Amino acid sequence: IPAWPPLRFGDEILSVNGKSIDSIRSDIRKYVSCSNETAVGFRTTVYAFTSTDADEYVVEYRRGNATDTVRIATRTDRNAREFIDFPKYAVSEEGCMLINDRIGYIDAAQFSNEQGRRIMNVLKNTEAIIIDLRRYPSDFMIFAFLGKYFAPYAINHVIFTHPVYSLPGCFREDRPAIGHDNPDYYRGAVIALVDGNTISQAEYTAITVQALPRGLTVGSTTLGADGNIAEIPLPGGYKTLISSLGVYYPDGSETQRCGVRIDHWAEPTPEGLLAGRDEVLEAAIRIAESMQ
């Protein structure tokens, strides 16, 4: 979590109100709708600091070799999500930057299709482009950007299944394509960074990157919740959510619940976080350099 006085970045939370994090995780597991265990961890972080009517929590934490307790104010669900928001990198207004003269970087959370041409003017001479999908994309880049600049021809990148409402239990398949014949497509490697914050449209974008001639993912298990959202109303004004369509790779393998395929595993370490390093990005840079 980020600094939250008197807690500091890098402190290890051991318990909240006398309950261990594992115990909190076990308590909420049967009540929350989560696609996989990565999603449960996300919910545990939020729930641990929002699930009381009291004004404060008693938190036990470890800092270095010492342990201590502190009282901290209760958070709402909305601002508790600050704990899992990924750091924002300093990039240009176009949402991109050059890591070096051979590797470009795009932050999907700051990307805009309107800037697509300018982004490619900046990055077109690189040998690899890293697209960071560890925060939610600010624009839908799949057709207007990835398809336009990165596909040499029409590529079937995903399978969607939709229920046939007149025939319960039956589903129809859609196999959309991105791109068109384009001799000037970007020929370098395209690397998508993913982790436990990668969800829904971000996962669909990662799947699309993997369909490109030199596309791959670097990171760790995603939330496995791509597809649209359909509400199911419940008594008492409550509701729950499902996806009313299936999302599969072109070979028919699943993406929902399990998350997207990870081509190269990489995740942060406590030591790396404390040192201010982005070890997932570092891994992607090493892979990009090895592909040149």
For each feature predicted by the language model, list its residue ranges.
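Flexible, low-complexity junctional segments that flank or bridge functional domains
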Residues: 1-137, 152, 156-158, 231-233, ...
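Stable alpha-helical elements in mature extracytoplasmic
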Residues: 45, 115-119, 142, 146, ...
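Gly/Ser/Thr-rich loop/hinge elements
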Residues: 81-82, 137-193, 197, 227-233, ...
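Anionic group-transfer/hydrolysis microenvironments
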Residues: 109, 134, 197, 221, ...
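Short, solvent-exposed amphipathic alpha-helical segments in soluble enzyme
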Residues: 121-124, 147-149, 206-212, 233-234
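Short, well-ordered alpha-helix to beta-strand connector turns
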Residues: 126-127, 187-188, 262
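Extended C-terminal subregions enriched in glycine
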Residues: 189-211, 216-223
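Active-site rim recognition segments
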Residues: 248-272, 277
